[in-house]
Amino acid sequence: PHAFAQPDAAKTQVKQSETAPVRSITEWNLAGSGKLAIDGYDPVAYFPEGGGTPTKGSEKITVKHEGVTYRFANEKNRDAFLATPARYEPAHGGWCSWAMREGDKVDIDPEAFIVKDDRLFLFYKGWLGDTRSKWQKGDHAAEAREADDAWKKVSGETARSVKPAGDSAQAKPTER
C-alpha cells in the first residue's frame, strides 16, 4: 500500500501545479535578487492573528512562494502563511495602493498600511506625503476597485477580493 501512496501524491502535486494560475512577478515590488517582499516585513504580522503590527521578519524564517520570498517573525506566522498564502500577500504586488489607482508603481513605507476586507494594502509615506491618509478620506471599496483594475493592466493579475466571514462589524480595518 505504501508504494502506491507515493505515486498518487506525486500525481496530485503535479496536477495542482498544472492548474495553478501562472503569474509574472516581474511587476512586483521586490527587493534584490532574492525577490524579497515587503522589505522583509512579516506579512502575517499585519493581520490581527499575527499581532496587527508591522514586524520585521527573520532571515532565518523564510518561505519562497511562487517566486517571492517572505520573511516571518516566528514559526506560527510562517505556518499561517503556508496554510493560506494568498490571504496574506500584499495587494497590488506590494506597491502603494493609492498610486496604483493610476497604474503607478510607487514604493511603500512598510509601516503605512491598512488591513481591510481580509486584504493587506500598503502605502507610500515620505517627503511627498502620506498616501494612506488620502485613501482613508475616500471610499475604500471604490479605491480598491480602481487599484485592482489598474494592477490587472500593469501585471495581468486579477486582484484577490476576499471578504471576511460574518457581519461588517468584524471587517473593521487595522491600520497604523
PLM region spans:
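C-terminal segment of classical bacterial N-terminal signal peptides
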Residues: 1-4
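Charged, low-complexity intrinsically disordered segments
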Residues: 6-176
